[in-house]
């Protein structure tokens, strides 16, 4: 029976960032404890990475709890973090998987870290939030993790290219975490509006965003605005379509790599992040009034191994 251990990047950075010896020690302990599979987080919420790619910067530091202190841990080592885990896992006879935080591009930590803080040309990639004050870039909100707009074509291409680089490693599997919208208030960019209006057959929404969701609303209202349920359906399609592309990107490099996701189990409210992780045979609309009859078509379970 497979037993997985998930190695979060930040929490384990003090031990592993600069020490192959500690990686070897803990993988031996994991094997001894009966684990069969190691999952290494190689793209934390800053959106920088711990594997070789030319597409984005390497993680230079993380914050982690050391005793009772939240401490900045710098990575001074230049060896390949993921490759060290792969080498040791193979030595120990363990299966090895990599996990990425997907639609993230920055974190408020240290005054702002990550692609969305460094590269102003990517400002349009940042998700646009439906706030009380109006539609606002996530960069100008208190949200600590700065999400991308999952519907933006350039974002999807960037992430698929990143996954191709990741699939070049000797991995058994790749997991996508945070493969979702930030929350119900995202994404209300002009890009998402344009795509939604096309999806609806070329209509023009006169009262935007109110005909979908009132500004500042962070949960479903008692009475649904005109286009709300179709909007939830559209968002599920955006994520479904991306997962198909991401799978194709990974399998195109290495057909044998397993492709999977990390999701929240609270299906009944997971519409708020635009994800239908059920099988397409499960008719969500039979059980929940927020789901249209087409919502089930975007259940992505079949994309996963």
Residue ranges of each PLM-predicted region?
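Glycine-rich, aromatic-flanked loop segments that form ligand/cofactor-binding clefts
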Residues: 37-46, 78-139, 175-178, 255-260
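Substrate-binding cleft/loops of secretory-pathway carbohydrate-active enzymes
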Residues: 105-108, 184, 243, 252-305
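Aromatic-lined carbohydrate-binding/catalytic grooves of carbohydrate-active enzymes
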Residues: 35-77
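Catalytic domains of carbohydrate-active enzymes, especially glycoside hydrolases
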Residues: 21-49, 169-173, 305
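Active-site-adjacent "subsite" loops/lids of carbohydrate-active enzymes
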Residues: 1-20, 98-169, 216-228, 282-288
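Aromatic- and acidic-residue-enriched segments that line the glycan-binding/catalytic groove
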Residues: 50-63, 104-139, 179-218, 272-288
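Active-site neighborhood of glycoside hydrolase catalytic domains
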Residues: 168-173, 177, 182-183, 187-261, ...
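An active-site-proximal structural segment forming one wall of the substrate-binding cleft
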Residues: 28-35, 88-89, 144-182
């Amino acid at each position: 029976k497979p037993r997985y251990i998930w190695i979060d990047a930040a929490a384990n950075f003090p031990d592993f960032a600069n020490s192959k010896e500690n990686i070897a020690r803990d993988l031996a302990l994991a094997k001894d404890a009966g684990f069969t599979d190691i999952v290494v987080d190689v793209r934390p919420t800053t959106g920088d990475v711990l594997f070789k790619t030319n597409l984005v910067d390497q993680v230079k530091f993380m914050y982690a709890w050391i005793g009772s202190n939240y401490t900045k841990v710098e990575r001074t080592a230049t060896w390949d973090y993921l490759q060290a885990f792969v080498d040791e896992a193979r030595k120990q006879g363990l299966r090895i998987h990599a996990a990425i935080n997907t639609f993230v591009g920055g974190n408020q930590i240290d005054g702002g870290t990550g692609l969305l803080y460094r590269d102003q040309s990517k400002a349009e990639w940042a998700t646009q939030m439906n706030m009380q004050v109006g539609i606002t870039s996530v960069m100008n909100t208190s949200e600590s993790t700065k999400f991308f707009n999952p519907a933006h074509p350039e974002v999807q291409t960037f992430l698929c290219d990143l996954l191709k680089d990741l699939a070049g490693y000797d991995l058994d599997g790749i997991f996508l975490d945070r493969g979702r919208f930030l929350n119900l208030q995202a994404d209300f960019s002009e890009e998402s509006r344009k795509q939604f209006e096309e999806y609806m057959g070329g209509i023009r929404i006169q009262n935007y965003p109110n005909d979908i969701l009132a500004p500042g609303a962070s949960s479903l209202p008692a009475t649904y605005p005109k286009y709300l349920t179709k909007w939830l359906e559209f968002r599920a399609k955006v994520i479904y379509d991306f997962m198909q592309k991401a799978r194709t990107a990974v399998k195109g490099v290495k057909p044998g790599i397993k492709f999977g996701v990390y999701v929240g189990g609270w299906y009944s409210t997971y519409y708020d992040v635009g994800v239908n992780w059920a099988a397409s045979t499960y008719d969500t609309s039979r059980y929940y009034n927020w789901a249209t009859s087409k919502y089930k078509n975007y259940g992505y379970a079949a994309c996963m191994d």
